[in-house]
Amino acid sequence: MNETEKRFEEFIENYLISEKGGWTKATDAGYCSDESKDMFLDIVTLTDFVKSTHPMAWKRFERMCTINPVRQFYKAFENAVTQDGLISVLRHGFKHRGINFRVCYFKPESELNEVSITNYQKNVCQCIRQWHYSKRNTNTVDMMLAVNGIPVVAIELKNQLTGQSVDDAMRQWQYDRNPNEPAFGFNKRVLAYFACDLYNVYMTTQLKGPETTFLPFNQGSAGAGKDGGAGNPKSTDGSYVTSYFWEKVLQKDSLLDILQKFINYERTERKETLPDGSTKKTISSKVVFPRYHQLDVVRQLVNHVRTNGAGHNYLIQHSAGSGKSNSIAWTAYRMASLHNENNDAIFNSVIIITDRRILDQQLQATVSSFDHTLGSVVTIDEKKNSGALRDAINDGKRIIVTTLQKFPVIYNEVESAVGKHYAVIVDEAHSSQTGQSALKLKAALADVSDALAEYAELEEKAIEEVEANDILVQEMLSQGKHSNMSFFAFTATPKGKTLEIFGEPQPDGSFHPFHIYSMRQAIEEGFILDVLANYTTYKMCYQIAKNVQDNPEVPTSKAVRTIRRYEELHPHNLQQKAAIIVETFREVTKKKIGGRGKMMVVTASRLAAVRYYHEIKRYLESNNYDDVEIMIAFSGSLKDPDDPTGTEYTESGMNVDRNGNRVKESQTKAVFHEEGNILIVAEKYQTGFDEPLLHTMIVDKELRDVKAVQTLSRVNRIYPGKEDTYILDFVNPIERIREAFQQFYQETSLDEEINFDLIYTTQKTLRGFGIYTDEDIEEVSSIYFDPDVRKANLTQGKISNALKPVADKYNELNQERRYQFRREVRALVKWYNYISQITRMFDKELHKEYVFCSYLAKLLPSDPVQPFDLDNRVKLEYYRLEKTYEGAIELESKPGSWKPTQPKRAGGQKDRTSPLDEIIQRINEEFYGEFTDADRVMVDTLYQKMRKDSKAKKAAKTEDRQVYERSLFPGIFDTTAQEAYMENTAAYEQLFLDADKYQAVMRALADRLYKELHDDK
């Protein structure tokens, strides 16, 4: 060994065997002794530990096993490890011949348990250099850490000053260490393998030869939990850059803590339907060792809660790829088992708010593997009613998983929270935390003792004089933050409101996350792929022509939307895009991930999704492509307005598997994973859809802000053989996408808190309408806050009756004023909900008006939207898809920030009108491209000829549209096109030279003429 490398090894050893490090210097003599032969552990050290911690049990065991009890003990230990795994045996021990043996003791939560502390101190923790791990060769591992003679961690060290790095250490594990060695048995001996040099640390939990996958175990370029990228920062104490590894991870108490509370064995079962209809079950398993940021965030949370108790909010900004599910599971377990210095549990229950089923399963498995005394995780899903949530809280279940929407039903049925403390973990925290359901969660769980004292002081009354049972007072007391509730909010994309509710307030008035694992770091460390690295944008260049003689006045915004929708759903547009989609899949996607790459098409509406589905099907059939399977995902059912008497489309009605069987909506994800190639979606699977084989996304929908990040991130999951992603965007310019991602690329903060008094501006504006009075508010309040009315279940009926005169006054307003009033009513309700999450206003009159407006907002009907149809007034004259960008969208290495949200003022709803010519010109200016005659959609002359043709008219009368389009119309079109060609060869030559254009024009005319001539009398 090189002297420089040796000094690095010695430095680490010297720390570990110091008083701070907690380990004992040892050699591998005990592992190579005759007593330990073929055991791959130090049996003498292990049995000495057992004798010292269970002396009576060992004596009993020796009486039972008179012949070589040590060998018998080893066999029992090995059987337990083979059956349950080393992690389980370390935590829970094993039972043999009626005797319970523990092979390791962990530090108790409370210092009051003296026996447990004594046994913990008896653990024999050895640091061994140059460990001879095999009897087949003389190879050694640089360093091994053993607990009571059992190898648990092995480390290969390299030093850049000798010309080697962590890459050499990883290669050594991959190529020079036989994974079949018993000492490296998966979950039987060594549990974690590290490669470390002067600057970087990597880790794996299973050796697989050259296939061994190492994960970065670095802090991040700015330090753990800080805003930065991959790597490690310069050491603050002048020591080695990687000193955190041995000081905060390998240190004895730290590593034993990881063995007890973090490292986890996960077993997953996946069922796959084979072509013959049979089911194949695949079982996989892995040992999960926490990544450094996961270890750091959980420990920081534990330390803060242990020091400060309940009552604090924590915002954890962890990117996709951070392992958020495990972080939540570890946080939940630690908070459920956390005790104070008096050995009292800090929290009575941990309540996890989530919509993810996979998290339920993961929590159940994780918690049960750690501590059997906590009981099982109680999941209140859609199969259980809200009463089950009430009972779980009242029974003091330690960990409860539920949705936010169940709290409004049971909030007043939960037993008094006085003296109780709750940890609320919010999975994917977002703006729903500012709604009424979040307020009801607080109403259910808040201990309002402190708020009551605060209110009494403001009212200048003694606490006992305050009518604490008054419903109005109760609701105000439940607002704001409470000393008995801690919120732990996890999200990758924190909005401004999320930051103000859960973030850390700073001296300068800004709000920041408690802990950060940024998108930038996740990408640089390779835990997610950069979805902006291969980005192509197209612009739809088209020209709309007016198809009427006059120039009618039409509502501007409606006309613009309608014309754009006309273009978006125009058959020619869909035909062109369908061709690009299919050819992109066949040329790009299909060749990725070993031929398993998949594509998602994100559409703007359910109708667009259905039409895309049919257009892609047509393109596949016309080109005889039989190697592309498409599926669709949308909610509910719909009919195509162009065919109102036709098929009613549903997701399950359109999807079939390879055997021709209908695919249930609940099976879409699984079947797409096994069989599908292209998935067309409409407002579905844009969040929470975890398909690692998804490589390409086609975007035909406007995306902004968080929605853009969440949608495009569907393709960022890593998978063996998946090296890149591809986005093809028909709608969004790169500047919009860059702006959306930049906000969440690194740390996201809020510049300053909201001005709470802005709600009084909204209140004043509302009163200016003269629609309701103080007397109206008092009448509604007297009903709402009357406990007898509530018991009789008469609240809704009485309030709706009281609001009838108010609704009548509202209906007397013109349409524009009605719209403005509705907006202001909803704004007051929304803003009061938000402010109530942050602070207690103790404004009785404002709270009454909030209740009044909450009911009024539900009773005021929106004005009916008048249907607006321009279909016969415009026509598509030019069309081209023009590629505008191809390459990477680069982001800057800087944090993002939000400005405080302001209440939106209600503008008028009345739409100004513009002449149709003006609107068409405006759209064409935006979308018109450089056109040649070859790009013109050749419709007009052919259309005029065919609409007069008797054969065309007769054909269009058929009720079977497919027969018309595929059998009758092509011959009529061909005859008409040839006649036009003979009349003007130059104008129509391109039509016959370009087969794709010929088909596109034919399909467009078939569609148009069928709609016009089918019902023409």
Question: Regions from the language model: what does each represent?
Answer:
Residues 714-743:
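Conserved segment of the helicase C-terminal RecA-like domain
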Residues 564-679:
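Conserved C-terminal RecA-like helicase domain
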Residues 2-349, 358, 362-373, 421, ...:
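ATP-dependent helicase/translocase motor core
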Residues 680-681, 686-710, 725-729:
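A short beta-strand element within the Helicase C-terminal
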Residues 390, 396-428, 432-444, 450, ...:
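Conserved RecA-like ASCE ATPase "motif II neighborhood" in helicase/translocase motors
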Residues 497-596, 613:
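Interdomain helical connector at the RecA1-RecA2 junction of SF1/SF2 helicase-like NTPases
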Residues 14, 18-25, 41-72, 276-280, ...:
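Catalytic cores and motor modules of nucleic-acid processing enzymes
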Residues 434-531, 541:
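Post-DEXD/H (motif II) to motif III coupling segment of the RecA-like Helicase ATP-binding lobe
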